[in-house]
Regions:
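Short loop/turn elements at sensory-signaling interfaces that couple input to output
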Residues: 1-8
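Sensory-domain boundary capping and coupling elements
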Residues: 10-12, 84
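PAS-associated C-terminal cap
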Residues: 13-27
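Histidine phosphotransfer helical core of two-component systems
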Residues: 27, 32-34, 42, 47-96
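Conserved short strand/loop->alpha-helix "switch" segment adjacent to the catalytic nucleotide/phosphoryl-transfer site
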Residues: 30-36, 40, 62, 94-96, ...
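Glycine-rich/acidic phosphate-handling loop/turn and adjacent ATP-lid/helix
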Residues: 174-200
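Glycine-rich ATP-binding loops of the HATPase_c
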Residues: 211-222
Length: 237
């Protein structure tokens, strides 16, 4: 107060330029999100075209071995296409909830291999796990190989079987994926660390790419058969 009078001070600042910049940044970010979404959509469509070409190739041969190879390649492509489809459908364009992906991919593979001779029961124990696309695709390919191998070989000598998938996070730092079956088990002469089959070689290479670890052992839950259990420990970042 000065001689009994109150004095007020006001500062005016022109922020119109800052607002213009903020709006431009917001518009630019929205445009980039749309472009990224479109990229995932186009990648998915291109992969589906490749898958369709494999289907046409398969229709041109009656050789069972060639058909099997074509179908294996087709499944690998479809597993990658499904990743891009899930991201395209999601609000988060940088990550995918692998929990939903596991169930969808396994079900898709199961339906393609299903025969009347074998009654395989699928079971899932899946936690929500967010993965960036550069980790989701290798994990998807690993899942594809193990599911396909189990459906092709594990139950060849039995009419019923169980295939179980467990997905969880440990210490908020690593993904743990377990794929197990109660089938005949992997023969003793086949060592995972040196197996020459393309599927198991892919699993080894992809696990190393992710800086992960894999353990292969007899399924301890089996009572009448050896079974197989793969356990993967993969860093989330």
């Amino acid at each position: 107060e000065i001689e009994g009078e109150k004095i007020y001070t006001a500062i005016l600042r022109d922020v119109s330029e800052r607002k213009i910049i903020e709006n431009d940044l917001r518009d630019s970010l929205a445009e980039k999100e749309i472009l990224l979404q479109e990229v995932h959509h186009r990648v998915k469509n291109n992969l589906q075209v490749i898958s369709s070409l494999f289907t046409l190739q398969g229709n041109s041969t009656d050789d069972p071995e060639r058909l099997a190879l074509i179908r294996e390649s087709q499944h690998r492509i479809q597993s990658m296409a499904l990743i891009h489809e899930k991201i395209y459908q999601s609000e988060n364009l940088a990550q995918i909830n692998f929990q939903h992906y596991v169930r969808d991919l396994v079900t898709e593979i199961f339906q393609s291999y299903q025969t009347s001779a074998v009654n395989v029961r699928l079971s899932f124990e899946l936690e929500a796990v967010l993965l960036e696309i550069n980790r989701a695709i290798p994990c998807a390919l690993i899942l594809n190989e193990l599911t396909s191998n189990a459906l092709k070989y594990a139950f060849a000598e039995q009419k019923n079987g169980n295939l179980k998938f467990v997905l969880k996070v440990e210490n908020e730092q690593q993904l743990v994926l377990t794929v197990s079956d109660d089938g005949k088990g992997i023969p003793d002469k086949i060592k995972f660390s040196s197996a020459k089959t393309l599927g198991l070689r892919l699993v080894r290479v992809l696990t190393r790419q992710l800086n992960g670890k894999v353990e292969l052992k007899q399924n301890p839950e089996c009572l009448k058969s050896r079974g197989t259990m793969f356990i993967f420990h993969i860093p989330l970042k």
